[in-house]
């Protein structure tokens, strides 16, 4: 059973764990992070809000020595410049910290595909050698032609070397539970069992 541990931002407030695995979820504001986390663990661990920019802290959820880390969304302009800079600084520091194993799941709204700000985050994550996997959310909103176009564009990013060959991608819908079983299986088999 997953449980909420704490909200943190500055380094002295981070959860300290030497021998644990942290799966981090990050994405643009309002990409559907909280809904995905709740669907993923099949329990309500994260508050779902229609208002973008709601998550402003690093939120930790724990089950034994496994952690889910919900990072504040990026690209939300309604916060003050100072608050955005502070959040960006501490998120960057958190992701660079190598005290425990971290794996990043970057959430992309399937309706927009990878945006300019997503590309910036991908470049940063690649530069710090963090394992990255992509989750295209809200896939139920796309028709078959749009899904095919999304997959084609994703493959172009793979070919362009922006994404590593080890980057996996998942098409999911938290609402309709599409793709969740594959995602859960991947996490259990390839991350938590290591």
UniProtKB/Swiss-Prot annotation:
GO BP, one annotated term: division septum assembly
Record bears the keyword Zinc-finger: no
GO molecular function, one term: GTP binding
InterPro entries: G_ENGB_dom (IPR030393), GTP-bd (IPR006073), GTP-bd_ribosome_bio_YsxC (IPR019987), P-loop_NTPase (IPR027417)
Binding site for GTP: 27-34, 53-57, 70-73, 137-140, 172-174
Gene3D superfamilies hit by this protein: P-loop containing nucleotide triphosphate hydrolases
Xref: SUPFAM superfamilies: P-loop containing nucleoside triphosphate hydrolases (SSF52540)
Entry's family note: Belongs to the TRAFAC class TrmE-Era-EngA-EngB-Septin-like GTPase superfamily. EngB GTPase family.
Annotated function: Necessary for normal cell division and for the maintenance of normal septation.
NCBIfam families with a match to the protein in the record: GTPase_YsxC (TIGR03598)
Name of the protein: Probable GTP-binding protein EngB
Organism, scientific name: Mycoplasmopsis agalactiae (strain NCTC 10123 / CIP 59.7 / PG2) (Mycoplasma agalactiae)
């Amino acid at each position: 059973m997953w449980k909420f541990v704490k909200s943190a931002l500055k380094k002295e407030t981070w959860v300290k764990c030497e021998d644990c695995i942290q799966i981090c979820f990050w994405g643009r504001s309002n990409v559907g992070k909280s809904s995905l986390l709740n669907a993923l663990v099949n329990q309500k661990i994260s508050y779902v809000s229609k208002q973008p920019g709601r998550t402003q802290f690093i939120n930790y959820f724990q089950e034994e020595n496994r952690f889910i880390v919900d990072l504040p969304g990026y690209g939300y302009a309604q916060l003050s410049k100072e608050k955005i800079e502070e959040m960006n600084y501490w998120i960057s520091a958190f992701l660079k910290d190598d005290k425990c194993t971290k794996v990043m799941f970057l959430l992309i709204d399937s309706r927009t595909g990878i945006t300019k700000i997503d590309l910036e985050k991908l470049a940063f994550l690649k530069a710090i050698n963090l394992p990255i996997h992509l989750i295209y959310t809200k896939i139920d909103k796309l028709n078959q032609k749009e899904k095919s176009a999304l997959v084609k564009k994703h493959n172009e990013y793979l070919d362009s070397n922006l994404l590593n060959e080890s980057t996996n991608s998942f098409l999911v819908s938290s609402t309709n539970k599409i793709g969740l079983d594959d995602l859960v299986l991947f996490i259990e088999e390839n991350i938590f069992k290591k």
